[in-house]
């Protein structure tokens, strides 16, 4: 995802590695953007995250309603990390070299938004398309709807990576080398992600949203499906409006092939291996080989951090429906009630995330630096994931007591259990704000000395996010099945990974260097 080439002709030693800083002669003075314009570009994240919030809160239960068992549901999510690993570096590479009259990043952002619209249509109407193609009715697997859903889901993840990577790259371009603006840009991005989350989870938690769009409920698409479809209508409208607004106000100047060649020549001279760069994957491999030690440690801490996060992000509402509420997919109302309670928890989480996003600068100064803050919140993450075990056992004890008293259908969990679960969601907003901001800001400072471009460098940090996601997607289903099919085993592994990430953040991750002018590529203005 995020990363930058640190340039300026000086050599700064950090943990035994030199960061080459030299001014980029092709950066126009007008590229230095105001905070207002940085915020406008960052606002696109609200549209992206609105859709992601719907994915995280509603799609795992939805695929199970289509007939995909829990063990296999995690494999559906492989498309996200796989597309992130391939698409984002690819888009970054070509956006670095784009000579469009609209600029380097804006064409990719616009294309990503258009692809999101196509994907949302396929996902929302998967059940209808499946029924029209001959899927059976009732509580059975619907293979054609599943196929349409999977295609739409893959397109959606490709679209999000096509959109989000260049959006972060444009923010880095606009920061024009200022560490302060870089930190603010990432904080703005995190803040608008929180706003998008709040909107998405609020929409997902309202069980009668389909009444606003009555045509969404059909014979093949029940109330839950119609609500999901309605949420996606709102999502794509928000994304298109924000994208058009940002791309209309913030301009990029067209660059020429000669300027690209000049930048490539400069990078080749700074390349530690002394060899010319190979296209795309060759550059990505070269970037990984030439990474300075601070960036390698950052990638390791980030990878452990995402091993901790991804099980909960993937199965949080499913955990509420099954373990906390004791429901079963497609049977009775308890599971649906739990999913909607989980969406409420995610909305509360996003409110905390938004407040924290605007407080990161002050908190980092208060605790002694960004790396120390990241270590502290990783401990908070580990404690919260461990507390899911306590909440689950309390809910099970409550249900067992009702079975003993002869109750055929247990009621929803008591207020104390539900409050404990929602408290976990709320507190997790604190470390999530840091996860969405600090790694990208540090990557901008610990930029790779591989000579890769702004967009391609984003793919380097992204690898530390998508590879753990692939690992969790492949292993969480079988791992959970070994312990009875619940979500807790993956959450416990996440708690261990968060603890390891905190230890490495405290002990190995170096502090960023003093403010230095980080050469930005030809930016927007």
From Swiss-Prot:
- Which cellular component appears as one GO term in the record? plasma membrane
The alphabetized UniProt keywords are: Membrane, Sugar transport, Symport, Transmembrane, Transmembrane helix, Transport
Q: Any keyword Zinc?
A: no
Give the UniProt record's GO annotations in the biological process aspect: sucrose metabolic process
Q: Where in the cell is it found?
A: Membrane
Q: Which residues lie on this side of the membrane: Cytoplasmic?
A: 1-37, 509-525
* Primary localization: membrane
Q: Which PANTHER family does this entry report, sorted A to Z?
A: SUCROSE TRANSPORT PROTEIN SUC1-RELATED, SUGAR TRANSPORTER
Q: List the protein's name.
A: Sucrose transport protein
* Phylogenetic classification of the source organism: Eukaryota, Viridiplantae, Streptophyta, Embryophyta, Tracheophyta
